[in-house]
Amino acid sequence: MKAALYVVGEPGSGKTTLVESLTAGWPRQEFDKPLGHVLFPEPGVVELGRRREGGFSGTDALSMSAITVAEPWVQDVFFPTDLLLAEGDRLAVDRFFQALLDGGWTLHVAWLDVPASLAAERRAARAAAAGSELQKESWVAGRRTKVMNLVSRWEDHVVRIGNHSTELMIAELVEASPVAAALVRGATYQGATV
């Protein structure tokens, strides 16, 4: 069985930090084609997106038209692994989630539901560290609304993660999602060894 774990949340909720923590120390192979992704041959996981210094990693680092490649790619019978990991806004859309289901994937959506004040502090710290401007609140509000709408529409696949520290988020995620548990514990998820 193929399983996908997609991490969503408003800007500054900790999506990139969480995914980087889940995959820390794994040997990595980066690819640009057919879609920007990282293959972790040991333990056998694909992470969609790219890592960039200063934030905006994951699927946010992909082309605006990434969905046109991602949709058929996850339905390809030659997909290199049975476990998929992704975070970010770019592919957090109904069309991609439906493509995963249509391709035979079990979908798990981890919603990082942190207080807006904490997310704002993190965004400010990220902007200061990168020497960039703070994201406009109207844009952040739009992203927050998009996430809330997505979570509402896909509620049967959503696991709410409400803790604030990365370590507690991982613990809560492991408790709620068999895919996350497989990633963290190095267990087997229905035939896929990690």
Which functions belong to the PLM regions below?
Residues 4-8:
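Short hydrophobic/aromatic beta-strand immediately N-terminal to the Walker A/P-loop
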Residues 9-14:
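Conserved glycine(s) of the Walker
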Residues 16-29:
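A conserved segment at the C-terminal end of the G1
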Residues 63-75, 93-96, 133-148, 170-176:
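Well-ordered, non-membrane alpha-helical segments in soluble/globular domains
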Residues 87-88, 103-125:
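Conserved phosphate-donor/acceptor-positioning beta-strand/loop module used by diverse small-molecule
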Residues 149-194:
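NTP-dependent small-molecule kinase module
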